[in-house]
Design a protein with these regions (language model features):
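Membrane-interface alpha-helices at helix entry/exit sites of multi-pass transporters
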Residues: 90, 149-165, 170, 185-189, ...
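Membrane-interface junctions of multi-pass transporters
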Residues: 31-37, 49-94, 211-219, 223-306, ...
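Membrane-interface helix termini and inter-helical loops of multi-pass transporters
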Residues: 2-12, 55-62, 114-119, 177-190, ...
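Transmembrane alpha-helical segments of multi-pass membrane transport proteins and ion-pumping complexes
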Residues: 21-30, 48, 52, 70-74, ...
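Transmembrane alpha-helices that form the ion-translocation and gating core
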Residues: 31, 85, 90-149, 289-346
């Protein structure tokens, strides 16, 4: 579609595309604060409006996907970097229990709903249930901004997210292997060994590498680039091991946690660049995936969407409630855990 001389829709000029996204990132908080709409939600809505299913101003091309992937990894890395390690160890059992709750409850409800309500096959129902069980930390910047990132409930929710995402991806790997007939003994040995080696490599060697680098390099730019290298290296190692890359980014954050003090200039740079560029690009990219017209094409789409929304909300609330009752948490902490576990993106697509 031709607008002006040399300007067509969707925008092809990289300068115009980048300018438009920067204007959205700049204007969104100014407008949305007056409307009492959360900043993160506003960026997702903006992505839906300008994306291929909206006004078609910008395509979700490789540059948007790259920036969005970096943003999601950045969120997971920051959650690991912000973690109070002593509190994380203290609440490790609670995170494990919550992770099992928030994986098993949605998994069970998802399989039943997929098979009996939606009429899917058993394998399709299990895959759908895996999407129910998985979650991300998309709202972590809000939690960090509110100053509750080190609260016990947040620690439990973050740890539980890693557990449930790991289990969900392993489930996906197993189902794919079963469908293709590759679940022999070597499949299980290879999967188990690769996961253990990946976790051990990141948690044991990353701190040593980081300590050596920070000791021998004092250049601010080089230190920040080194951190980015560690984030993406951890994510890729997790991918090679058969895990979700966000797990590797989170482990990289935990591994470098003690090397980057909370009030250090490097930490300020990490948070600034993430909150200003990477994370907003990710949220806008998520919005571009939304095709609102799909809800009006046929009754089946509305039915599937309604079942997913109701069951995911119910399952995650039940998991948060069970966690509260098990560990005698307050109702506010239950609400925080529930809110943190309802966050979904396209991480399993």
């Amino acid at each position: 579609m031709l607008l002006f001389d040399g300007i067509t829709l969707p925008l092809e000029d990289p300068i115009l595309k980048f300018l438009l996204i920067l204007v959205i990132i700049l204007a969104a908080p100014l407008l949305l604060n007056k409307l009492k709409i959360p900043y993160l939600l506003g960026l997702i809505i903006a992505g839906a409006v300008i994306g291929p299913h909206g006004l078609n101003l910008v395509l979700r091309d490789s540059s948007i996907i790259l920036s969005g992937t970096a943003g999601l990894l950045y969120i997971m890395f920051l959650s690991g970097l912000d973690m109070d390690m002593s509190d994380f160890r203290k609440n490790g059992t609670r995170s494990l229990v919550f992770g099992l709750y928030t994986f098993c409850v949605p998994l069970l409800l998802g399989i039943l709903a997929g098979y009996y309500i939606l009429g899917f096959s058993i394998y399709s129902s299990i895959l759908l249930a895996g999407l129910f069980a998985s979650q991300t930390l998309i709202a972590y910047p809000i939690v960090s901004k509110l100053g509750i990132a080190r609260d016990k409930a947040v620690t439990i929710a973050v740890g539980g997210t890693v557990i449930t995402d790991t289990l969900a991806l392993l489930l996906l790997t197993v189902i794919v292997g079963m469908v293709t007939g590759n679940t022999d003994d070597m499949f299980w040995y290879r999967l188990g060994i690769s996961v253990v080696l990946c976790i051990a490599f990141i948690m044991q060697l990353f701190p040593l590498i980081g300590h050596w680098f920070f000791k021998h390099c004092s250049d601010n730019i080089s230190q920040y680039i080194f951190v980015l290298v560690m984030v993406f290296l951890g994510a890729y190692l997790a991918h090679l091991a058969g895990l979700e890359p966000i797990i590797g980014a989170f482990l990289a954050g935990l591994a470098l946690n003690r090397l980057i003090p909370r009030t250090s200039p490097l930490m300020n740079r990490i948070e600034f660049v993430g909150n200003a560029i990477f994370i907003p690009f990710f949220l806008i990219g998520v919005g571009m995936l939304i095709d609102y017209r799909a809800f009006f094409r046929d009754w089946e789409s509305i039915k599937v969407a309604a079942v997913m929304i109701v069951l995911i909300t119910a399952a995650k609330y039940i998991a948060a409630l069970l966690t509260q009752k098990t560990f005698k948490l307050s109702s506010d902490q239950r609400t925080v855990i529930f809110g943190r576990s309802e966050e979904h993106t396209s991480e399993l697509q």
